[in-house]
């Protein structure tokens, strides 16, 4: 299966299936000398693991990570880092009824057409559990970025029609509610809405936003590896993401140039912008402002209602899905978005190191 490797210099290869023995990731290109422990990675994995509240699947997984290689005496060695998480609570029998039929909204049909064979247990590689490897790698990338003064903060911006207004965002509230919303009032309203949808055996869409601060100007590789293009690719590769916005996003359509342009000014010796409609990127490179990316997630396709579908033999049937499923994807995907952004920014920072001769001189003429 191609397409499981991401990155050029900081590379991430995820592996494993939802109902296999385990899942994991191999990270290559991580600099040596970074203090790293299983606890550092576990903090990230705990943010996405199931069964933490009423709005997540009841699948009972500890998602405990083990480091197999690449760490010695608590520090990265510069060699490939292998991380593994074992599956503990698979209930594959819940999926026996779909072995010969296609779930609406899922990738079952497409996998069958592509490979002529598929792991129907929980979706295999298309399951949300595939993101375990991404999050583990993101924890490592974030640790490196922290050494460079770069931080990432992601949160649930909207659930259904309930959206946190720009002037109501309080990042201190993100970890104070189970939906990771930056406003507790909106979180309470969203929780009530989710309970209503769950009673109707339905699911809800959401928006996850990520702010990246501390990235110096000039990071990103024109033309095809632009910063915003790579961020969009990374986040769009997360299952269920249907749209990406950078900065003002689609709102620029109704804007005019004189409003949309971010005027520059000098703050001492530093070039800054008075506004940030561009979302921290210009010409595919960072401009020194906070980078803002927004991802729209479709409603969870696994709903507990009767739905029309077809079998592998092309027979039309009515299906009722069983199993344990989230009524919403966004909140558990917050750390996944954050992780993919961290991986992307670190990879582009490494590529940027060779952009100027002065950079090489600082390294090799010290």
List each model region and its residues.
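Short acidic, glycine/tyrosine-flanked loop/strand segments centered on an H-E-D-like triad
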Residues: 99-124, 307-325
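Alpha-helical support elements that line or immediately flank enzyme active sites
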Residues: 21-33, 129-150, 225, 229-233, ...
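Glycine-rich, mobile lid/loop segments that gate access to catalytic sites or pores
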Residues: 113-223
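A short glycine/serine-rich beta->alpha loop
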Residues: 11-14, 119-130, 217-221, 276-281, ...
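Glycine-rich, N-terminal phosphate-binding loop and its surrounding beta-alpha-beta segment
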Residues: 45-104, 108
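Glycine-rich anion/phosphate-binding loop at the beta-strand->alpha-helix junction
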Residues: 15-21, 201-204, 208-316
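Internal helix-turn-beta structural module
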Residues: 11, 302-366
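N-terminal, positively charged regions that mediate nucleic acid binding
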Residues: 1-59
């Amino acid at each position: 299966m191609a397409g499981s490797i991401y990155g050029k210099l900081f590379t991430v290869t995820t592996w494993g299936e939802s109902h296999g023995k385990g899942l994991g990731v191999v990270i290559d290109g991580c600099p040596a000398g970074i203090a790293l422990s299983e606890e550092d990675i576990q903090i990230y994995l705990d943010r996405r693991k199931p069964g933490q509240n009423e709005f997540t699947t009841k699948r009972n997984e500890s998602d405990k990570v083990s480091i197999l290689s690449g760490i010695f005496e608590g520090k990265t060695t510069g060699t490939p880092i292998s991380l593994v998480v074992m599956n503990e609570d698979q209930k594959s029998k819940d999926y026996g009824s779909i072995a010969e039929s296609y779930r609406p909204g899922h990738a079952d049909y497409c996998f069958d057409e592509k490979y002529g064979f598929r792991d129907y247990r929980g979706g295999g590689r298309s399951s949300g559990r595939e993101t375990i490897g991404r999050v583990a790698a993101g924890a490592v990338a974030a640790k490196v970025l922290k050494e460079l003064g770069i931080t990432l903060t992601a949160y649930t911006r909207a659930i259904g029609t309930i959206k946190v207004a720009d002037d109501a965002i309080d990042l201190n509230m993100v970890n104070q509610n189970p939906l990771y919303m930056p406003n507790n009032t909106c979180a309470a309203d969203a929780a009530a809405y989710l309970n209503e949808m769950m009673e109707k055996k339905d699911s809800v869409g959401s928006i996850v936003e990520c702010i990246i601060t501390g990235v110096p100007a000039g990071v990103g590789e024109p033309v095809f590896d632009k910063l915003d293009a790579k961020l969009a690719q990374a986040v769009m590769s997360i299952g269920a993401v249907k749209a990406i916005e950078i900065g003002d996003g689609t709102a620029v359509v109704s804007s005019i140039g004189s409003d949309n342009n971010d005027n520059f000014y000098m703050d001492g010796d530093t070039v800054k912008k008075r506004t940030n409609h561009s979302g921290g990127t210009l010409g595919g490179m960072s401009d020194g402002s906070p980078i803002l990316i927004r991802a729209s997630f479709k409603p969870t396709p696994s709903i507990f209602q009767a739905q029309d579908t077809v079998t592998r033999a092309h027979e039309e049937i009515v299906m009722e899905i069983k199993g344990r499923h989230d009524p919403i994807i966004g909140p558990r995907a917050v750390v996944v978005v954050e992780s993919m952004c961290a991986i992307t920014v670190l990879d582009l920072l490494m590529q940027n190191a060779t952009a100027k001769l002065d950079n090489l001189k600082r390294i090799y003429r010290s």
